[in-house]
A protein has these predicted regions:
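Conserved glycine-rich Rossmann-like NAD(P)H-binding loop of the short-chain dehydrogenase/reductase
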Residues: 1-13
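Substrate-binding pocket helix/loop in short-chain dehydrogenase/reductase
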Residues: 66-85, 131, 208
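A short, exposed helix-loop element centered on a Lys and neighboring polar residues
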Residues: 96-97, 147
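Alpha-helical segment proximal to the catalytic Tyr-Lys
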Residues: 101, 151-152, 236
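Catalytic loop of short-chain dehydrogenase/reductase
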Residues: 112-155, 166-169
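Short C-terminal tail/terminal secondary-structure segment
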Residues: 121, 210, 214-216, 226-229, ...
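Short, small/polar-rich loop/turn modules that mediate ligand/substrate recognition or access, typified
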Residues: 154, 159, 238-240
Length: 252
């Protein structure tokens, strides 16, 4: 297994966790929006293991800019969109393009792009954070790229699918939630986790767990199970699809 994370600490920690199970792990730390880092990651996998069978693009996020230029009112907008697209769309696209020659040569491969419910039609747009519009757009772009790539790669026995996680209280969302209940006038004093899940007083009618058919949040294990299925031989004839793992929030 080869893993990459921007945080060297996170990479080391995950490597240790995986090695407990006897997994052979190559860990690389670096900015995955940079093509040099992407090529190093792919090359390390091929050199170490002789081949790559599966690519999971579990990368995303956005950029909240602190740029302030009175002479250029679009500077902040530009910085936010550039940062968000680099992380949530450009990085997974470049990673796919880097591994495709190897997959085509072997006439085999699985690609799984982790998108977001934010990129799905019917997902409500709640303008709560500065990166919202750019993030929704980038994740929608990743879904469309997945579909187009599946059309192109099917003849090479390469499956390309996407997964859209639902309501999961990740470290990133924890940080955003804490900022919202600290500074937003409508949510001050609320519990960050309850705010994120949509069960706090200020957010109950805005969307969240109470508005989903299953009435429960999702977990990282839910997403892992979906990844395992789409990476297995059981999904040999599934390609170009986007699997929502969201408790029924979006039905498209």
């Amino acid at each position: 297994l080869i893993i990459n994370s921007f945080s060297e600490e996170n990479t080391r920690s995950l490597k240790k966790e995986l090695e407990v199970f006897g997994t052979r792990v190559v860990a690389i730390s670096g900015d995955i929006t940079q093509s040099k880092v992407i090529l190093e990651t792919v090359d390390a996998g091929i050199q170490t293991f002789g081949k790559i069978d599966i690519l999971v693009n579990n990368v995303g996020g956005g950029s909240v800019s602190e740029v302030v230029e009175k002479e250029n009112p679009l500077a902040e907008v530009e910085a936010v969109w550039d940062g968000t697209y680099a992380m949530s769309l450009k990085a997974p696209v470049l990673m796919c393009e880097a591994v495709l020659p190897h997959f085509i040569e072997r006439q085999s491969g699985k690609i799984l792009n982790i998108s977001s419910m934010a990129g799905r039609p019917g997902m409500p747009h709640v303008d709560l954070v500065p990166l919202s519009s750019s993030y929704h757009s980038a994740k929608a772009g990743l879904i469309r790229y997945t579909q187009l790539l599946a059309d192109q790669m099917g003849r090479h026995n390469i499956n390309v699918n996407a997964i859209c996680p639902g309501i999961i209280y990740t470290d990133g969302w924890k940080e955003i939630s804490e900022e919202m209940v600290k500074h937003h006038p409508n949510y001050k004093g609320e519990d960050p986790r309850e705010w994120f899940l949509g069960v706090s007083a200020g957010r109950y009618s805005e969307g969240g767990v109470p508005q989903t058919p299953m009435r429960r949040e999702q977990t990282t294990n839910d997403i892992a199970e979906a990844v395992v299925f789409l990476a297995s031989d059981s999904s040999a004839n599934i390609t170009g699809q986007t699997l929502n793992v969201d408790g029924g929030m979006v039905k498209d």
